[in-house]
Regions:
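Membrane translocator/pore-forming domains, dominated by Gram-negative outer-membrane beta-barrels
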Residues: 1-3, 42-326
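Interface/linker segment at the passenger-translocator junction
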Residues: 1-59
């Protein structure tokens, strides 16, 4: 139905929050100290920054809108190795996104997101536990174009949103060689996100044909099982070795799987009807690669790439960053 493109705001907001927690997870999973050594003068402090780009697409199904979202942004974070077992920290992220959608109408706009991330990792012998809490807020703009006969009209909207997510991951270390330089980690991951895009009224040449859009709220949980394979590769002149990583997961969603909004014409905003976005597949195959290369005695340059593939939807993202050990 005309107007279904407004649902792209809510579902893209949710997907962006889930991507964000995945990026933080990739960093936190590599934190902590090497248990093979004696560590004195703790705590140890670290700071890192990274730039990230992503592309996500949800296929349109008839009059049920999908979306395409391209984002770019960055994260600054700090973490502390409090003792041999426990690491904690925080990070701030700003992402800027370009959003398009097509169904019975077409739409384009911006979806900018800002996140505060708190995280902790605990290592006990071969078991590791990881917890991430992320809160976010959003600024969004969307311009819809509706064609009729030989003409068209445009309707402009702007709004804000917020969201919260939590993620827990459990992993077990299996050494694949005698010096433990190659580690296989079977893992279990559970997460939940809840988002809200505030309602708004459109303006522009649409006049009374513009829409009053009510709040869009989504809550989705996911459980995943998979494995992470990491290994040391080469070393620099200071004896510090590079770390390579491959990740694969199968993830299952529960809860909301499509965007939905109640809308009414400005001519009679008391009468509303629901419009729906395309439904996304609940089972995903997720894969990622990472490489951390030491620089000097205290720095590390890292790169990451990730993909999420499921029925009707796919996304890819990559990041590059620098980490400094004080």
């Amino acid at each position: 139905a005309a107007g279904s493109t407004v649902t792209s705001l809510g579902i893209a907001q949710r997907d962006s929050l889930r991507d964000q927690m995945g990026w933080i997870r990739n960093r936190v999973a590599q934190m902590g100290v090497n248990p093979a050594y004696v560590h004195e003068d703790m705590p140890y402090f670290h700071m890192w920054m990274q730039g990230t780009g992503s592309y996500a697409k949800l296929d349109t199904k008839g009059d049920e809108s999908g979306y395409e979202l391209t984002t770019w942004g960055g994260t600054v974070g700090m973490d502390v190795d409090i003792n041999d077992n426990f690491t904690a920290g925080a990070a701030f992220t700003a992402n800027y996104g370009s959003l398009t959608a097509n169904a019975a109408d077409t739409a384009d706009g911006d979806l900018d997101s800002y996140y505060v991330n708190l995280f902790a990792r605990y290592q006990s012998r071969k078991w590791s536990h990881l917890l991430i809490l992320t809160g976010g807020w959003n600024d969004a703009k969307l311009t819809r174009t509706v064609d009729y006969g030989s003409g068209s009209y445009q309707a402009h909207g702007s709004t804000t949103g917020s969201g919260f997510g939590a993620m827990y991951e459990l992993a077990y270390d299996i050494a694949l060689n005698e010096d433990k330089s190659v580690i296989l980690q079977p893992l279990f991951n559970a997460s939940i996100v809840t988002t809200r895009m505030d309602g708004y009224s459109e303006s522009g040449s649409a006049g009374n044909a513009g829409l009053r859009v009510e709040d869009q709220e989504l809550t989705t949980a996911a459980v995943a099982v998979g494995a992470r394979l990491s290994g040391l590769m080469g070393s620099n002149v200071f004896g510090r070795e590079a770390l390579g990583e491959i990740r694969v997961n199968v993830s299952q969603d529960m809860g909301d799987r499509r965007g939905q909004a109640n809308v009414g014409f400005l001519a009679d905003p008391s009468y509303t009807r629901p419009v729906y976005g395309a439904k996304v597949g609940s089972t995903a195959f997720q894969a990622g690669v990472g490489l951390s290369v030491p620089v000097g005695t205290q720095g590390v340059i890292f790169v990451d790439g990730n993909a999420d593939i499921r029925s009707g939807s796919s996304s890819i993202n990559g990041s590059i960053g620098y980490r400094y050990n004080f």
